[in-house]
Amino acid sequence: SSDSGKTEITWWAFPVFTQEKTGDGVGTYEKSIIAAFEKANPDVKVKLETIDFKSGPEKITTAIEAGTAPDVLFDAPGRIIQYGKNGKLADLNDLFTDDFVKDVNNENIVKASKAGDKAYMYPISSAPFYMAMNKKMLEEAGVANLVKEGWTTDDFEKVLKALKAKGYTPGSLFSSGQGGDQGTRA
């Protein structure tokens, strides 16, 4: 609580890709969410603290282990779910109403928010991950048949080795920035 009589909650967030496009700086996206939340909840004040990708993960872990974590944290599923599994986070199942799940309209996003039957993460956004391949190269290397739904890590390794044997460099990673793609933080 703050001196104003309002309940104060603290929100830690990493920068998101939309901030790079607005020119308004870090926290622009979050501030728009806070404004809407505070309007709907006039007795609550939200204090935003943006954290960076270099020191943020350690800061989060230290705070959670010390019992001084923020009230709200915007982070990647991998860390969040692990904290939940370790008993460090509140169970959010009561927020996963039938209407909410219907509104999310994606069973995988709902599943990613949970460890077992307990929700530890409330999804407010999602980002697509994809892989593109050169079909001609795969055919020349004789491994196009391995690239199919349900392919395994072993299949993927076979594809990489076959491409390399044909003289191709079998891999590329595009990273616009840590705030815009998870590939650099996963």
Which residues does each PLM region occupy?
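Conserved N-terminal structural module of periplasmic/extracytoplasmic solute-binding proteins
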Residues: 1-82, 101, 145
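Stable alpha-helical elements in mature extracytoplasmic
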Residues: 25-33, 56, 60, 76-79, ...
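Class I S-adenosyl-L-methionine
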Residues: 31, 35-38, 84, 93, ...
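Helix-loop-helix "hinge/cap" segment bordering the ligand-binding cleft or interdomain interface
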Residues: 39, 97, 113-180
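Short beta-strand elements of ligand-binding domains
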Residues: 73-76, 92-95, 124
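Short beta-strand-centered segments that line the small-molecule binding cleft or hinge
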Residues: 80-110
